[in-house]
């Protein structure tokens, strides 16, 4: 009911934050996407899902250490998400080990590329942001690519969050200018 009231009040996008997919990746393609479909059923606004890799939880940090040099876990669920009614998929790309080529598995979806690391107070440069977007553009059409943060900025100091958002805007503008100059 809350989602329908929010939509009726003018909300354009409803994003589902999915913290369990990464823990239960083997099962998420079956039950997780069905749960998302059920939650989004009847909504006419844009729907998105953020599959969170998690922050600060010892079990999650330990799990990440076992993933090796490439985090290919998304490969298990992206085909099911691509076939779903969810419109957008949000990915953590800055300083993660998720290979950019996995984005190709989300054909037909808008891909929100996390270009800001929320686990560090170090502010990205516009060049770093533009480079991350350039990598994504090898696998996602320009009209389907959206720049975003890896996750929420709430835990960090306001001035750091502001600087990171400014880097996101400047980096996206830089990437756009480079694309436009090639056209």
Question: What is each residue range found by the language model?
Answer:
Residues 1-183:
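Domain-level signal for soluble alpha/beta catalytic cores
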């Amino acid at each position: 009911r809350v989602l329908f009231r929010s939509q009726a009040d003018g909300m354009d996008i409803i994003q589902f934050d999915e913290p369990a997919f990464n823990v239960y990746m083997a099962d998420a393609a079956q039950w997780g996407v069905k749960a998302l479909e059920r939650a989004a059923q009847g909504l006419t606004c844009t729907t998105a899902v953020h599959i969170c890799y998690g922050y600060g939880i010892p079990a999650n940090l330990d799990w990440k250490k076992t993933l090796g040099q490439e985090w290919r876990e998304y490969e298990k669920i992206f085909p099911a998400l691509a076939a779903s009614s969810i419109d957008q998929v949000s990915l953590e790309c800055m300083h993660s080990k998720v290979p950019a080529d996995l984005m190709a598995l989300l054909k037909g979806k808008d891909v929100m590329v996390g270009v800001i690391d929320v686990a560090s107070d170090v502010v990205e440069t516009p060049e770093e942001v533009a480079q991350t977007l350039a990598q994504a553009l090898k696998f996602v059409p320009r009209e389907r690519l959206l720049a975003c943060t890896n996750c929420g900025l709430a835990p960090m100091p306001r001035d750091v969050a502001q600087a990171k958002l400014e880097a996101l805007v400047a980096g996206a503008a830089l990437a756009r200018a480079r694309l436009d100059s090639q056209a």
